[in-house]
C-alpha cells in the first residue's frame, strides 16, 4: 500500500462493457448530457468503459438551453461519449433522477419481494415488464 497503514490493496483490470445505458436529466440532440442532481452516479465512467453508449433523458432541449438550469460542471456527458440519445421521461424509474423525481421505494420493495418467488416474479413480469411500450410500463406503475 502507498498509505502509512500498509493496508493490503487489490488491483484488477477494469471491466470492459459492450454497451452502456445511462439516464440524464437533460440532453441535446447531439448527445451532450446534463445532470441536475447531487450525484452523477458514474454515468460518465460507464460511457468511457463501453464500446457503445446510449443515453436516455427526461427532456431533450436545444443546446443553448443546457446551461440555463445548471453550471458548466453539470454537463458531464459530451457528444463524443454517446452513440444515441432518446427522450424518455421517467426513464430512470424505479431509481431516482433528482430533482425530477426520487426513488420509488414501494416499487423497489415490490420488485425485491417478487424476485424471491417464481410465481410472484412471473406476475410482476407480466404486469410491468412484458408490456408493449414505455408508456404502458409507466401506466402500469401509476395504476398500482
Feature map (PLM): residue ranges:
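Conserved phosphate- and dinucleotide-binding cores of soluble alpha/beta proteins
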Residues: 1-144
Amino acid at each position: 500500500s502507498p498509505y502509512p497503514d500498509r493496508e493490503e490493496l487489490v488491483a484488477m483490470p477494469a471491466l470492459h462493457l459492450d454497451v452502456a445505458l445511462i439516464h440524464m436529466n437533460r440532453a441535446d440532440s447531439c448527445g451532450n448530457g446534463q445532470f441536475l442532481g447531487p450525484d452523477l452516479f458514474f454515468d460518465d465512467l460507464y460511457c468511457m468503459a463501453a464500446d457503445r453508449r446510449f443515453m436516455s433523458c427526461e427532456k431533450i432541449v436545444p443546446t443553448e438551453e443546457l446551461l440555463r438550469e445548471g453550471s458548466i460542471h453539470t454537463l458531464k456527458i459530451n457528444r463524443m461519449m454517446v452513440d444515441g440519445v432518446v427522450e424518455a421521461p421517467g426513464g430512470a424509474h424505479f431509481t431516482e433522477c433528482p430533482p425530477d423525481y426520487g426513488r420509488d421505494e414501494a416499487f423497489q420493495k415490490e420488485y425485491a419481494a417478487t424476485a424471491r418467488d417464481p410465481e410472484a416474479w412471473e406476475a410482476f413480469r407480466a404486469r410491468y415488464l412484458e408490456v408493449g411500450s414505455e408508456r404502458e410500463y409507466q401506466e402500469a406503475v401509476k395504476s398500482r
